[in-house]
Amino acid sequence: MNLNNEPIRAKRGTALTAKGWVQEAALRMLMNNLDEEVAEHPDQLVVYGGIGKAARNWPSYHSIVSSLTTLDNDETLLIQSGKPVAVFKTHEDAPRVLLANSNLVPAWANWETFHELDKKGLTMYGQMTAGSWIYIGSQGIVQGTYETFAECARQHFGGSLKGTITVTAGLGGMGGAQPLAVTMANGVAICVDVDRSRIDKRMETNYLDIVAHTLTEAIEEAELAKKEGIPLSIGLVGNAAEVLPEMLDRGFVPDIVTDQTSAHDPLNGYLPKGFTNEQGQVLRREDPQAYISLAKKSMAEQVEAMLELKKRGAIVFDYGNNIRQVAFDEGIRDAFSFPGFVPAYIRPQFCEGKGPFRWVALSGDPADIDKTDEVILQEFADNEPLCQWIRMARRHISFQGLPARICWLGYGERARFGKRINEMVASGELSAPIVIGRDHLDAGSVASPNRETEAMKDGSDAVADWPILNALVNTAAGASWVSVHHGGGVGMGYSLHAGMVVVADGTAEAARRLERVLTTDPGLGVVRHADAGYQKAIETAKATGIVIPALAREGKENG
């Protein structure tokens, strides 16, 4: 257990605990992942996404903390599935930490094998940003969720969700962004979760507006708000596998239907219908196989209801939790007849190297984030959608843990922003260094055929070289810490992905690292999509001077 049994909270201010700011940044971000304001179950080291953890167990956590505190500026700490396994002498431009989480040999890459190894204390589920120490609470996915719903509005509802009702489920660390994202797009949302504490947490952080005690009340509130054209988010305690069929029985068809339950993990992330949380915990402990079987059956029934709502006119899409795959495996042959959110709404942004870029103020002072917001508004004043996002984020988003900001910046923009931030740290305009990172859900850092790389133009959905190349090139470029994970978002066997973090500490060395890393990282996203044949990515590469040998050869041959 935690040695002093006190809540974990990252240190604030400019006094160092570690030997350098990069090590200090890793230490603070590890602790921030487990802050009670941030993590879903910090007492279990669980950050978000079912059982996505920051460290394998408490001894490993304390060993990591100790290692980061004593790590020299030319050493690298190796983390194997949440456990520190070695410190090697490297060099000052090398990452201070390299992490590999949840990786299994492909033929063994399934939940059954993972759970066996997990019970033996040999592995840990890192999700995406849980095990890579760059989770910032629900804000981390808010803009991506907003961009998804905004694009859905552009394609189907004339550019706004005003006068529409979205029904979704799952209000955990990721799904909790949905109600705020929908209301930011001027829509109405009914958000279902089996766990009242999750609903309460979203209320506390102003992501949810109200709580309905019955489905009848939720529908009445939603229809009234829709009629009046006002944005409103409604939390409803319930099981989506029961609520969606009941909506069908009542003849209630929402405008949009999706789902962000933790369906990627049938044992720990989804409650079978007919069970209370307490009953589910007992069955999970006493007969996990029976629990998994019932959970999968319930998922299939939920997907059947989603398919029927689609037939009745709702816009339905998968939000990347692999629920369609489970339903398909359970015999629902048309489970994939509604699309995933990436091919439906997000991929064009990936072609420009855009994705969920984020930064965190190690000072703990919200004023530092206010100043970085101003940088975005000044440096990118010609990008009105981006500036509009920053203005909305300032108005609506509450910080969880260390103050942070998320916004989707693309190739060229990230390096430009990083340079400016480093200058502000150097001048003292910002009171302490800034951590810059991103979600693993990014343009060139993930292979996930049921999510980020679904329906690739050239059929390369399952090609997993790209996240490996991403981790390698970011390591070579001098990222502060780099991670390679398996199974995030969609579960064991369905994804490989990489993360990176780079620290702006105001030094000339940091400036060079920032320039390299914030170029190679989004650059590979452009390359990955250009290689798959996306014209927008090819044009972006040509316009920005990214060297792609195949394109260069084509140019010479055509010239």
UniProtKB/Swiss-Prot annotation:
Pathway: Amino-acid degradation; L-histidine degradation into L-glutamate; N-formimidoyl-L-glutamate from L-histidine: step 2/3. Transmembrane segments: none annotated. Binds 1 NAD(+) per subunit. Keywords: Cytoplasm, Histidine metabolism, Lyase, NAD. It is found in: Cytoplasm. GO terms for biological process: L-histidine catabolic process to glutamate and formamide; L-histidine catabolic process to glutamate and formate. PROSITE patterns: UROCANASE (PS01233). It comes from the Bacteria. Its main location: cytoplasm. It catalyses: 4-imidazolone-5-propanoate = trans-urocanate + H2O. The active site is at C407. Its cofactor is NAD(+). It is an enzyme of class 4 (lyase). GO terms for molecular function: urocanate hydratase activity. GO terms for cellular component: cytoplasm. The keyword Lyase applies. NAD(+) binds at residues 49-50, 127, 173-175, 193, 198, 239-240, 260-264, 270-271, 319, 489. Its EC number is 4.2.1.49. Catalyzes the conversion of urocanate to 4-imidazolone-5-propionate. HAMAP family: HutU (MF_00577). Belongs to the urocanase family. This is Urocanate hydratase. It comes from Shouchella clausii (strain KSM-K16) (Alkalihalobacillus clausii). The lineage of its organism: Bacteria, Bacillati, Bacillota, Bacilli, Bacillales. The gene is hutU.
